[in-house]
């Protein structure tokens, strides 16, 4: 506070506000914040004038934070009232002023009387309705600002302070201690001053960031001239394909954009190598899309997969269904199929080859036997015929043309024989008696087979007419003689 003692707070320039000017990182990630307000509670650490102090807790595991400087000093430098970092870029004042070539070190007085007069003039212009804007918002950011600016909040700096009793080994609170039980880091960053941060002089954090910016270089183009793809990493749900296209289209014509959401990356392919080199040079270390900093590097060509052994390809057999292990091993051990003469195409496969074969379809499985000798003989004949050539067509259907010899199965399993023999002229009468057909609804029954109709024995049939004729002849002779 000034050396003069005034009873009028408004005339003295004491600050009274309703809400602080703070950055998003200091406010915290919790949208519901309980904040306390104390008018004229502390004096500003820059101008030493009393101001309204706000105090809140930005998170569950964070420490309580409060405003350190008044809003007048905050507006002069466009910084946060708590961390004294730039409100727009999140950088220290020294880094921002160096990158934008701004010299404000001599514009703010340092003596008590001059500081008070300077602050009163600034407050008077604000009350008069003048739109007082600093030159920070009118200057466009350059490459250094884009490389170093913070695009997302950094809540880690809201953690609790280190417990001093733990450092000496005397803390008895254990897990209930509200401070961190860690050893402090020693170095230049541990020696920070709030006034040096505000004026931008000898700030160790700013010197570290400026040194990091000088070490950043451009991307080196690969020697392979066929590479025209750029890798973009660090994507999130807010970055869409159209946003990436708008950012890269200004440097050349784009051939394709491939986004891998599960890996949070994208690949941008240009039609020419010159467009890819121009984009890599202009956007290296300064690619920001929708407020998200992205990583940009050259894409690597995909390594071709090693070819499989040719012997394994020839020995592999595709199965349309589940086959027994013995059958699979037998098929895999068979030699490759023979080529046809004169390079003819292979013959067509039979229609039942694509049908899946299951172990339960084998009639000889689980000890099944034939019902009769005749059916067994006919089944064995049909089995031999099917194994030698192919299945006989149904009755009345014959192939029209056979341009090729009987097909060879080419290392595949022969088709399974039919459980029942097909119908043809040479079928036995026993099959008709063993497998009668039931008439369906609305169909007329078939007439019985001539061989199946029951008839009397031949002797009885021929004896009946002969006996009756003999009796009639004897009767005729007796009648004649009597007459």
Swiss-Prot record:
Residues 370-380, 392-401, 409-423, 460-476 have a biased composition (Low complexity). Keywords: DNA-binding, Metal-binding, RNA-binding, Zinc, Zinc-finger. Residues 298-317, 336-483 are annotated as: Disordered. Coiled coil: none annotated. Residues 381-391 have a biased composition (Polar residues). Residues 336-351, 438-459 have a biased composition (Pro residues). A zinc finger (C3H1-type) spans 157-184. One of its GO terms (molecular function) is DNA binding. Residues 228-301 form the RRM domain. SUPFAM superfamilies: CCCH zinc finger, RNA-binding domain, RBD. InterPro entries: Cwc2/Slt11, Nucleotide-bd_a/b_plait_sf, RBD_domain_sf, RRM_dom, STL11/RBM22-like_N, Torus, Znf_CCCH, Znf_CCCH_sf. It comes from the Eukaryota. This is Zinc finger CCCH domain-containing protein 25. It comes from Arabidopsis thaliana (Mouse-ear cress).
